[in-house]
Amino acid sequence: PLIKFLIPFLLLQHHSVNSQPPPSPISAYETVAFGFGFFDKDDPNVFLLGNASVSGGALRLTNTDQFGKPVPHSVGRALHITPIHLWNKNNGELADFSSGFSFVVNTKGSTLRGDGFAFFLAPANLNFPKNSSGGYLGLFNPETALDPSKNQIVAIEFDSFTNDWDPNSPNQSPHVGIDVDSIKSVATVPWPSELEPDNAVAHASLNYNSESKRLSVFVGYPDNRNATVSTIVDLRNVLPEWIRVGFSASTGDLVETHDILNWSFEAA
């Protein structure tokens, strides 16, 4: 199939920090494959930033209180420590990659929700912005969000709350979008999350084909509600040679949990 989902999970584990990611090593593997069947708080391969934590084997990107309720204006990020050689400046070769993960976005009973999470690709030494809660999803802020010249990032957003820059504004319409150097998505599709129960597990798969330059995303639920979106983007024009991948999420005045249950990634 076009969209590959890594079945064998390498039981890597995970380390919690609140600083920026480490610098890129002098050398790194040309082919990268990793997977998590669950998350373990004691392993150094995943860096946690901001409010991200591990709870019950899941990667919880935003904060909850002592009763397990999501809290407002929380921002959390998690990224894999391994630098990925996305493209080669000497010969122009570009990598293919695929990723799959399961997740739960839970409002804990509220009919209002916000704000969402994203899977992202970013420079290996990215400094994450401050003031990035709410609709900025932990990846942008008011100064950078709509100015591509100030960003170097590609993200797949699972956006629960419709902001001014989102499709169908001012009507509320959760959506999956592909972001290229801006919080305003270049391609979107409705995300049927509001039709699902609070604890519904969704499965997402994404694939990048280096020949066609097509980035494709699929998200589905066990009841066969699903969505798919894609766009053409030459990542050599957007991202540096070396990148890292991870997740970011935020709440604003409205809240929900953002939990990643498992994750696989392969690039070659």
Give the predicted meaning of each segment.
Residues 1-268:
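Polar, low-complexity loop segments and adjacent catalytic/binding residues used for recognizing
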